[in-house]
Swiss-Prot record:
GO MF term list: NAD(P)H dehydrogenase (quinone) activity; NADH:ubiquinone reductase (non-electrogenic) activity
UniProt-listed Gene3D superfamilies: 3.50.50.100
Protein name stated in the entry: Type II NADH:quinone oxidoreductase
Magnesium recorded as keyword: no
Reaction it catalyzes: a quinone + NADH + H(+) = a quinol + NAD(+)
Record keywords: Cell membrane, FAD, Flavoprotein, Membrane, NAD, Oxidoreductase
Lineage: Bacteria, Bacillati, Bacillota, Bacilli, Bacillales
Gene Ontology process terms (BP): aerobic electron transport chain
Annotated function: Alternative, nonproton pumping NADH:quinone oxidoreductase that delivers electrons to the respiratory chain by oxidation of NADH and reduction of quinones, and contributes to the regeneration of NAD(+).
Record: residues binding FAD: G12, A13, G14, Y15, A16, N39, K40, V83, D302, A319, Q320, K379
Top-level class of the enzyme under EC nomenclature: oxidoreductase
Cofactor info, note text: Binds 1 FAD per subunit.
Active-site residue list: E172
Length: 402
């Protein structure tokens, strides 16, 4: 009977949460569980495409689709609300639109920008964090070119762009930016030689997940297109002028009209308020993706710190891992509803590709290094597959990269 159905509550409609729900609605009949999905936006956005929307090479509307377009209303109830509290003892979740109880909870609250306490970074630098920040940044960059072209007294700092971080997001954003800049220069009649793009990275190596050969390929590609790198250069502050960096123990001001922070993410701050032992918004899970002392709570995606058996460090936060976790949790929930136990999660690493604009890239696919157009093609395959896994052929045809 309806009142006997277990209540499955999923928090967050990013890669992990939405994969959980769409898999559950395939695995379960309408009378097997009462499934509710809560998300603060009515839409899902492809977070791994934010660098494109931020640079202005992809319209933000191409990143989003309505959540209700991929869920079955007879099996899943969608609540457009923001989670404000998780009460584990009462087995309730509070939101700005009501309180919801659960028998099984899936926490997939996603990421937010992490500035590591750098003074002024939140106030003066643009973030690559969500649809709103992407739209704001892309408009700002174009406005700088337009203002430069229209002003009688030219200020070259309007054409100077600082990017903090040479990790995945920073490099992919730079790749898009090197495609966007020539378009803006042509549109506004700006001399491209006056544009300065500088990437600042505190670590001694960029893209640490890749070999030196792949890193050198990416560096050469971007340097050939005007990007200057300052590696092993910590940013100690951000202000209205740009970044303050430390070089040879001396602080130096780097000036630019645009400063962008792309060097860190963390899990939702709600995690610290809801659970013990949380670091940077992530909690260590057991092998079955539940948390210690709570077999009824699964934690996945950017708020999960999953350490594979025999390893010492948690897996990174990637869309590939999040979607595999979502799929696994859906299967475990089906097991639980059938009186069986949740099973251990095993991650299958299919590879990683870092785009350098639309037509180039570097990556590792099934253990092999790839570069150039082959990498760019694989990136499009990966992006399109993520859409297909959630929304099927129709959504992949509409939103995919082919």
């Amino acid at each position: 009977m309806a009142q006997d159905r277990k209540k499955v509550l999923v928090l967050g409609a990013g890669y992990a949460g939405l994969q959980t729900v769409t898999k559950l609605q395939k695995e379960l009949s309408a009378d097997e569980a009462d499934i509710t999905l809560i998300n603060k936006n009515k839409y899902h956005y492809e977070a791994t495409w934010l660098h494109e929307a931020s640079a202005g090479t992809l319209n933000y509307e191409d990143l989003i689709y309505p959540i209700e377009s991929v869920i079955k209303e007879d099996k899943v109830k969608f609540i457009n609300a923001e989670v404000t509290k998780i009460d584990r003892n009462a087995k309730k979740v509070e939101t700005n639109h009501g309180i919801y109880d659960y028998d099984i909870l899936v926490v997939a609250l996603g990421f937010e920008s992490e500035t590591f306490g750098i003074n002024g970074m939140k106030d003066y630098a643009f973030q690559i964090e969500n649809i709103e920040t992407a739209r704001k940044l892309s408009r700002h960059i174009e406005d700088k070119f337009a203002n430069y072209a229209a002003s009688k007294e030219k200020d070259d700092k309007d054409l100077a762009i600082l990017v903090g971080g040479a990790g995945f997001t920073g490099i992919e954003f730079l790749g898009e930016l090197t495609e966007r800049i020539p378009e803006l220069c042509n549109k506004y009649g700006v001399d491209q030689n006056k544009v300065r793009v500088t990437c600042v990275e505190a670590a001694p190596k960029m893209l640490p997940m890749f070999s030196d050969e792949l890193v050198n390929y990416a560096v050469n590609y971007l340097e050939d297109r005007g990007v200057e790198f300052k590696i092993a250069t910590p940013i100690v502050a951000c202000n209205e002028k740009g970044f303050v960096v430390k070089i040879n123990d001396q602080e130096q001001q780097l000036e630019a009209g645009t400063a962008i922070w792309a060097a860190g993410v963390r899990g939702s701050k709600l995690m610290e308020e809801s659970f013990e032992g949380v670091k940077r918004g992530r909690i260590v899970t057991k092998q079955d993706l539940t948390i210690e002392g709570h077999d009824d709570i699964f934690v996945i995606g950017d708020v999960s710190a999953f350490i594979p058996a025999g390893e010492e460090r948690p897996l990174p936060t990637t869309a590939q891992i999040a979607m595999q976790q979502g799929e696994h949790v859906a299967k475990s929930i089906k097991n639980i509803l059938n009186g069986q136990a949740a099973t251990d999660f095993e991650y299958v690493d299919r590879g990683t590709v870092c785009s350098l604009g639309a037509h180039d890239g570097v990556g590792i696919v099934y253990g092999r290094d790839i570069t150039g157009k082959k990498a760019a093609f694989m990136k499009k395959v990966i992006d399109t597959r993520a859409v297909f896994k959630i929304g099927g052929v129709g959504l992949a045809f509409k939103k995919g990269k082919f």
